[in-house]
Amino acid sequence: MRLSDFHYELPPELIAQRPLAERSASRLLCLDRDTGALADRRFRDLPDLLNPGDLLVFNDTRVIPARLLGVKRDTGGRVEVLVERVLDEHRVLAHVRASKSPGEGVVLWLEEALEAVVEGREGDLFCLWFAGDLPVIELLERHGHMPLPPYIERPDAAEDRDRYQTVFASRPGAVAAPTAGLHFDADIMARMRARGVETAAVTLHVGAGTFQPVRVEDVSRHVMHAEWTEVSTQVCDQVAACRARGGRVVAVGTTAVRSLESAAADGELKPFSGDTRLFITPGYTFRVVDALVTNFHLPESTLLMLVSAFAGYEPVMQAYRHAVAERYRFFSYGDAMFIGPQEASDKMQETSGRGERPRFDHEI
Protein backbone atom coordinates (compact mmCIF):
# COMPACT_ATOMS: atom_id res chain seq x y z
CA MET A 1 0.00 0.00 0.00
CA ARG A 2 0.98 3.63 -0.42
CA LEU A 3 1.61 6.15 2.33
CA SER A 4 -0.98 8.45 0.80
CA ASP A 5 -3.63 5.75 1.31
CA PHE A 6 -3.47 6.56 5.03
CA HIS A 7 -3.98 10.30 4.72
CA TYR A 8 -7.08 12.00 6.09
CA GLU A 9 -8.01 15.63 6.61
CA LEU A 10 -8.01 16.75 10.25
CA PRO A 11 -8.99 20.26 11.33
CA PRO A 12 -6.27 21.50 13.73
CA GLU A 13 -8.83 22.45 16.37
CA LEU A 14 -9.68 18.75 16.85
CA ILE A 15 -6.17 18.02 18.18
CA ALA A 16 -6.63 17.84 21.95
CA GLN A 17 -4.20 20.18 23.72
CA ARG A 18 -5.16 19.26 27.29
CA PRO A 19 -6.79 16.30 29.02
CA LEU A 20 -10.41 16.38 30.11
CA ALA A 21 -11.14 16.92 33.79
CA GLU A 22 -11.96 13.22 34.21
CA ARG A 23 -10.06 10.42 32.48
CA SER A 24 -13.12 8.31 31.64
CA ALA A 25 -15.18 11.28 30.38
CA SER A 26 -13.68 10.80 26.91
CA ARG A 27 -15.86 9.73 24.03
CA LEU A 28 -15.58 6.20 22.66
CA LEU A 29 -16.19 5.37 19.01
CA CYS A 30 -17.06 1.68 18.72
CA LEU A 31 -16.27 -0.15 15.49
CA ASP A 32 -17.64 -3.64 15.03
CA ARG A 33 -14.81 -5.64 13.51
CA ASP A 34 -17.25 -8.06 11.86
CA THR A 35 -19.86 -5.74 10.35
CA GLY A 36 -18.25 -2.30 10.20
CA ALA A 37 -21.06 -0.81 12.30
CA LEU A 38 -20.20 2.35 14.25
CA ALA A 39 -21.59 3.58 17.56
CA ASP A 40 -20.90 6.79 19.48
CA ARG A 41 -20.49 6.14 23.20
CA ARG A 42 -18.57 7.30 26.27
CA PHE A 43 -15.42 5.63 27.54
CA ARG A 44 -17.09 4.87 30.85
CA ASP A 45 -19.35 2.50 28.84
CA LEU A 46 -16.39 0.20 28.10
CA PRO A 47 -17.05 -2.31 30.92
CA ASP A 48 -20.50 -2.94 29.41
CA LEU A 49 -18.87 -3.86 26.08
CA LEU A 50 -16.64 -6.48 27.69
CA ASN A 51 -17.65 -10.01 28.62
CA PRO A 52 -16.92 -11.98 31.80
CA GLY A 53 -13.77 -13.96 31.14
CA ASP A 54 -12.25 -11.43 28.74
CA LEU A 55 -8.62 -10.51 29.35
CA LEU A 56 -7.57 -6.86 29.08
CA VAL A 57 -3.83 -6.48 28.42
CA PHE A 58 -2.29 -3.16 29.45
CA ASN A 59 1.14 -1.66 28.86
CA ASP A 60 2.56 -0.86 32.31
CA THR A 61 5.43 1.34 31.09
CA ARG A 62 5.95 4.61 32.94
CA VAL A 63 6.81 7.83 31.12
CA ILE A 64 10.00 9.44 32.37
CA PRO A 65 10.41 13.25 32.33
CA ALA A 66 12.85 12.82 29.48
CA ARG A 67 13.15 16.36 28.08
CA LEU A 68 15.99 18.60 29.29
CA LEU A 69 16.90 22.14 28.23
CA GLY A 70 20.31 23.71 28.58
CA VAL A 71 23.49 24.92 26.93
CA LYS A 72 26.88 23.73 25.80
CA ARG A 73 29.14 24.62 28.71
CA ASP A 74 32.00 26.03 26.63
CA THR A 75 30.07 28.03 24.02
CA GLY A 76 26.70 28.75 25.62
CA GLY A 77 24.88 27.43 22.57
CA ARG A 78 21.39 26.23 23.35
CA VAL A 79 20.60 22.51 23.37
CA GLU A 80 17.51 20.41 23.89
CA VAL A 81 17.91 16.80 24.99
CA LEU A 82 15.26 14.11 24.69
CA VAL A 83 16.30 10.87 26.33
CA GLU A 84 15.37 7.89 24.17
CA ARG A 85 16.67 5.05 26.31
CA VAL A 86 18.34 4.69 29.71
CA LEU A 87 21.34 2.37 29.34
CA ASP A 88 22.50 2.19 32.96
CA GLU A 89 22.60 4.38 36.06
CA HIS A 90 24.61 7.12 34.34
CA ARG A 91 24.33 6.62 30.59
CA VAL A 92 21.52 7.29 28.15
CA LEU A 93 20.89 7.39 24.42
CA ALA A 94 19.29 10.69 23.51
CA HIS A 95 18.23 12.97 20.71
CA VAL A 96 20.12 16.27 20.95
CA ARG A 97 18.85 19.34 19.13
CA ALA A 98 21.35 22.18 18.67
CA SER A 99 22.40 24.65 15.99
CA LYS A 100 25.59 22.60 15.67
CA SER A 101 25.70 18.96 16.75
CA PRO A 102 27.94 18.51 19.81
CA GLY A 103 31.02 16.40 19.29
CA GLU A 104 32.58 13.79 21.52
CA GLY A 105 33.73 15.25 24.84
CA VAL A 106 31.43 18.27 24.75
CA VAL A 107 29.89 19.01 28.15
CA LEU A 108 26.21 19.95 28.35
CA TRP A 109 24.84 22.00 31.26
CA LEU A 110 21.17 21.07 31.59
CA GLU A 111 18.35 22.62 33.64
CA GLU A 112 20.99 24.65 35.53
CA ALA A 113 21.65 21.55 37.59
CA LEU A 114 22.92 18.62 35.53
CA GLU A 115 26.19 17.97 33.73
CA ALA A 116 26.23 15.53 30.84
CA VAL A 117 29.20 14.57 28.66
CA VAL A 118 28.83 13.48 25.03
CA GLU A 119 30.60 10.11 24.79
CA GLY A 120 29.80 9.40 21.15
CA ARG A 121 27.00 8.58 18.75
CA GLU A 122 24.93 5.57 17.75
CA GLY A 123 23.32 6.53 14.46
CA ASP A 124 21.08 9.54 15.06
CA LEU A 125 21.35 9.22 18.83
CA PHE A 126 23.96 10.60 21.21
CA CYS A 127 25.42 8.61 24.08
CA LEU A 128 25.46 10.90 27.13
CA TRP A 129 27.09 10.28 30.52
CA PHE A 130 25.52 12.07 33.48
CA ALA A 131 27.81 13.11 36.32
CA GLY A 132 26.91 12.76 39.99
CA ASP A 133 25.99 10.11 42.51
CA LEU A 134 22.29 9.79 41.69
CA PRO A 135 20.95 7.42 39.04
CA VAL A 136 19.92 9.18 35.85
CA ILE A 137 16.29 8.10 36.30
CA GLU A 138 16.17 10.00 39.59
CA LEU A 139 17.84 13.03 38.01
CA LEU A 140 15.22 13.07 35.27
CA GLU A 141 12.38 12.76 37.80
CA ARG A 142 13.76 15.78 39.66
CA HIS A 143 14.70 18.05 36.79
CA GLY A 144 13.18 16.81 33.52
CA HIS A 145 10.12 17.96 31.62
CA MET A 146 7.37 15.59 30.53
CA PRO A 147 8.01 14.85 26.83
CA LEU A 148 4.71 15.98 25.39
CA PRO A 149 4.17 15.14 21.71
CA PRO A 150 5.08 17.81 19.14
CA TYR A 151 1.43 18.39 18.20
CA ILE A 152 0.66 19.60 21.75
CA GLU A 153 1.58 23.22 21.22
CA ARG A 154 2.19 24.38 24.78
CA PRO A 155 4.85 23.92 27.45
CA ASP A 156 4.42 20.99 29.80
CA ALA A 157 2.52 21.81 32.98
CA ALA A 158 2.26 20.33 36.46
CA GLU A 159 -0.90 18.41 35.52
CA ASP A 160 1.00 16.52 32.82
CA ARG A 161 3.09 14.74 35.46
CA ASP A 162 -0.13 12.95 36.42
CA ARG A 163 -2.30 13.01 33.32
CA TYR A 164 0.35 12.01 30.74
CA GLN A 165 0.73 8.82 32.78
CA THR A 166 -1.59 5.84 33.11
CA VAL A 167 -2.93 4.89 36.54
CA PHE A 168 -1.20 1.50 36.22
CA ALA A 169 2.21 2.80 35.07
CA SER A 170 4.93 1.06 37.08
CA ARG A 171 8.08 0.44 35.00
CA PRO A 172 9.96 3.64 34.06
CA GLY A 173 11.39 3.82 30.57
CA ALA A 174 8.95 5.35 28.07
CA VAL A 175 9.35 8.78 26.51
CA ALA A 176 5.77 8.80 25.22
CA ALA A 177 2.64 7.55 26.92
CA PRO A 178 0.72 4.44 25.83
CA THR A 179 -2.21 6.76 25.33
CA ALA A 180 -5.08 4.26 25.13
CA GLY A 181 -4.46 3.60 28.81
CA LEU A 182 -4.90 7.25 29.79
CA HIS A 183 -8.71 6.86 29.84
CA PHE A 184 -8.78 4.24 32.60
CA ASP A 185 -9.47 5.35 36.16
CA ALA A 186 -10.15 3.57 39.46
CA ASP A 187 -13.89 3.39 38.81
CA ILE A 188 -13.47 1.79 35.38
CA MET A 189 -11.00 -0.73 36.79
CA ALA A 190 -13.35 -1.64 39.66
CA ARG A 191 -16.34 -2.07 37.34
CA MET A 192 -14.36 -4.36 35.05
CA ARG A 193 -13.29 -6.52 37.98
CA ALA A 194 -16.90 -6.71 39.18
CA ARG A 195 -17.94 -7.83 35.69
CA GLY A 196 -15.41 -10.67 35.73
CA VAL A 197 -12.94 -9.12 33.29
CA GLU A 198 -9.34 -10.05 34.04
CA THR A 199 -6.25 -7.93 33.44
CA ALA A 200 -2.63 -8.56 32.51
CA ALA A 201 0.36 -6.30 31.92
CA VAL A 202 3.08 -6.31 29.29
CA THR A 203 5.80 -3.69 29.02
CA LEU A 204 6.83 -1.72 25.95
CA HIS A 205 8.93 1.37 26.53
CA VAL A 206 7.55 3.75 23.91
CA GLY A 207 10.32 5.66 22.15
CA ALA A 208 10.37 9.06 20.50
CA GLY A 209 10.41 7.25 17.18
CA THR A 210 6.67 6.77 17.55
CA PHE A 211 6.29 10.40 16.39
CA GLN A 212 8.69 10.14 13.45
CA PRO A 213 6.94 10.36 10.08
CA VAL A 214 7.07 7.62 7.48
CA ARG A 215 9.27 9.05 4.72
CA VAL A 216 8.70 6.53 1.90
CA GLU A 217 5.60 6.32 -0.28
CA ASP A 218 5.83 2.52 -0.53
CA VAL A 219 5.11 1.58 3.10
CA SER A 220 6.71 -1.85 2.68
CA ARG A 221 10.08 -0.05 2.51
CA HIS A 222 9.64 1.69 5.88
CA VAL A 223 12.14 0.66 8.57
CA MET A 224 10.46 0.52 11.97
CA HIS A 225 12.22 1.99 15.00
CA ALA A 226 13.24 -0.41 17.79
CA GLU A 227 11.48 -0.42 21.15
CA TRP A 228 12.15 -2.64 24.16
CA THR A 229 9.33 -4.93 25.20
CA GLU A 230 8.70 -7.75 27.64
CA VAL A 231 5.97 -10.38 27.77
CA SER A 232 6.24 -12.56 30.85
CA THR A 233 5.46 -16.23 31.40
CA GLN A 234 2.55 -15.10 33.58
CA VAL A 235 1.02 -13.15 30.70
CA CYS A 236 1.39 -16.14 28.37
CA ASP A 237 -0.38 -18.31 30.95
CA GLN A 238 -3.16 -15.73 31.34
CA VAL A 239 -3.71 -15.61 27.58
CA ALA A 240 -3.85 -19.42 27.43
CA ALA A 241 -6.39 -19.50 30.27
CA CYS A 242 -8.46 -16.83 28.53
CA ARG A 243 -8.52 -18.88 25.34
CA ALA A 244 -9.50 -22.03 27.28
CA ARG A 245 -12.52 -20.35 28.86
CA GLY A 246 -13.66 -18.79 25.59
CA GLY A 247 -12.73 -15.22 26.47
CA ARG A 248 -11.26 -12.56 24.22
CA VAL A 249 -7.82 -10.99 24.46
CA VAL A 250 -8.38 -7.22 24.43
CA ALA A 251 -5.24 -5.15 23.88
CA VAL A 252 -5.22 -1.69 25.43
CA GLY A 253 -3.27 0.28 22.86
CA THR A 254 -1.13 -0.44 19.83
CA THR A 255 1.89 -0.95 22.08
CA ALA A 256 0.17 -3.87 23.82
CA VAL A 257 -0.67 -5.27 20.37
CA ARG A 258 2.93 -5.05 19.22
CA SER A 259 4.20 -6.63 22.44
CA LEU A 260 1.86 -9.61 22.23
CA GLU A 261 2.27 -10.13 18.51
CA SER A 262 6.07 -9.85 18.79
CA ALA A 263 6.03 -12.60 21.41
CA ALA A 264 4.00 -14.77 19.04
CA ALA A 265 6.12 -14.15 15.95
CA ASP A 266 6.66 -17.88 15.33
CA GLY A 267 2.95 -18.64 15.70
CA GLU A 268 2.87 -19.46 19.41
CA LEU A 269 2.83 -16.97 22.29
CA LYS A 270 6.02 -17.37 24.33
CA PRO A 271 7.81 -15.26 26.94
CA PHE A 272 9.81 -12.55 25.22
CA SER A 273 12.19 -9.81 26.30
CA GLY A 274 14.13 -7.56 23.94
CA ASP A 275 13.79 -5.08 21.12
CA THR A 276 10.97 -5.30 18.63
CA ARG A 277 10.72 -3.71 15.20
CA LEU A 278 7.40 -5.31 14.35
CA PHE A 279 5.65 -3.23 11.68
CA ILE A 280 2.00 -4.22 11.23
CA THR A 281 0.24 -3.22 8.02
CA PRO A 282 -2.89 -4.49 6.21
CA GLY A 283 -2.36 -8.12 5.29
CA TYR A 284 -0.86 -9.05 8.66
CA THR A 285 -2.35 -12.12 10.39
CA PHE A 286 -3.02 -11.44 14.07
CA ARG A 287 -2.12 -14.37 16.31
CA VAL A 288 -3.13 -13.16 19.78
CA VAL A 289 -5.33 -10.05 19.85
CA ASP A 290 -9.11 -10.26 19.41
CA ALA A 291 -10.19 -6.71 20.30
CA LEU A 292 -8.50 -3.35 20.69
CA VAL A 293 -8.85 -0.15 22.68
CA THR A 294 -6.94 2.64 20.94
CA ASN A 295 -6.78 6.39 20.49
CA PHE A 296 -7.06 8.22 17.17
CA HIS A 297 -3.73 8.33 15.37
CA LEU A 298 -1.91 10.75 13.09
CA PRO A 299 -2.50 10.65 9.35
CA GLU A 300 0.02 8.47 7.50
CA SER A 301 1.36 7.01 10.78
CA THR A 302 2.45 3.43 11.44
CA LEU A 303 -0.16 3.29 14.22
CA LEU A 304 -2.99 4.07 11.81
CA MET A 305 -1.63 1.33 9.56
CA LEU A 306 -1.74 -1.13 12.47
CA VAL A 307 -5.35 -0.26 13.28
CA SER A 308 -6.24 -0.61 9.59
CA ALA A 309 -4.63 -4.04 9.56
CA PHE A 310 -6.70 -5.05 12.58
CA ALA A 311 -10.14 -3.84 11.50
CA GLY A 312 -9.83 -3.44 7.74
CA TYR A 313 -8.65 -0.43 5.78
CA GLU A 314 -12.01 0.87 4.52
CA PRO A 315 -13.89 0.47 7.85
CA VAL A 316 -11.13 2.28 9.73
CA MET A 317 -10.90 5.17 7.29
CA GLN A 318 -14.70 5.46 7.36
CA ALA A 319 -14.55 5.51 11.17
CA TYR A 320 -12.00 8.34 11.05
CA ARG A 321 -14.17 10.34 8.67
CA HIS A 322 -17.07 9.83 11.06
CA ALA A 323 -14.94 10.92 14.02
CA VAL A 324 -13.92 14.13 12.24
CA ALA A 325 -17.52 14.88 11.26
CA GLU A 326 -18.70 14.28 14.84
CA ARG A 327 -15.92 16.46 16.29
CA TYR A 328 -14.10 13.81 18.28
CA ARG A 329 -10.88 14.91 19.99
CA PHE A 330 -7.73 13.44 18.43
CA PHE A 331 -4.33 12.07 19.48
CA SER A 332 -2.73 11.63 22.91
CA TYR A 333 -5.16 13.62 25.07
CA GLY A 334 -8.08 12.89 22.77
CA ASP A 335 -10.89 10.35 22.58
CA ALA A 336 -10.72 6.60 22.01
CA MET A 337 -11.98 3.73 19.89
CA PHE A 338 -13.08 0.24 20.83
CA ILE A 339 -12.69 -2.25 18.00
CA GLY A 340 -14.14 -5.65 18.69
CA PRO A 341 -15.80 -8.66 17.11
CA GLN A 342 -19.57 -8.79 16.79
CA GLU A 343 -20.19 -10.54 20.11
CA ALA A 344 -18.61 -7.57 21.89
CA SER A 345 -20.95 -5.16 20.16
CA ASP A 346 -24.44 -6.51 20.80
CA LYS A 347 -25.41 -3.13 22.25
CA MET A 348 -24.14 -1.13 19.30
CA GLN A 349 -26.59 0.89 17.26
CA GLU A 350 -25.32 1.30 13.71
CA THR A 351 -24.70 4.94 12.84
CA SER A 352 -23.08 4.48 9.47
CA GLY A 353 -26.36 3.91 7.63
CA ARG A 354 -24.89 0.98 5.72
CA GLY A 355 -26.87 -2.23 5.61
CA GLU A 356 -24.32 -4.07 3.51
CA ARG A 357 -21.34 -5.69 5.14
CA PRO A 358 -18.14 -3.97 3.92
CA ARG A 359 -15.28 -5.82 2.33
CA PHE A 360 -12.26 -6.10 4.61
CA ASP A 361 -8.99 -5.68 2.78
CA HIS A 362 -6.93 -8.26 4.66
CA GLU A 363 -5.33 -9.46 1.41
CA ILE A 364 -3.96 -6.15 0.18
Curated annotation (Swiss-Prot):
Annotated segments matching region Disordered: 344-364
Taxonomic superkingdom: Bacteria
Chief localisation class: cytoplasm
Pathway of action: tRNA modification; tRNA-queuosine biosynthesis
Recorded GO MF terms: S-adenosylmethionine:tRNA ribosyltransferase-isomerase activity
Chemical reaction(s) catalysed: 7-aminomethyl-7-carbaguanosine(34) in tRNA + S-adenosyl-L-methionine = epoxyqueuosine(34) in tRNA + adenine + L-methionine + 2 H(+)
Physiological role: Transfers and isomerizes the ribose moiety from AdoMet to the 7-aminomethyl group of 7-deazaguanine (preQ1-tRNA) to give epoxyqueuosine (oQ-tRNA).
Family that this chain belongs to: Belongs to the QueA family.
Protein name: S-adenosylmethionine:tRNA ribosyltransferase-isomerase
Organism, scientific name: Thioalkalivibrio sulfidiphilus (strain HL-EbGR7)
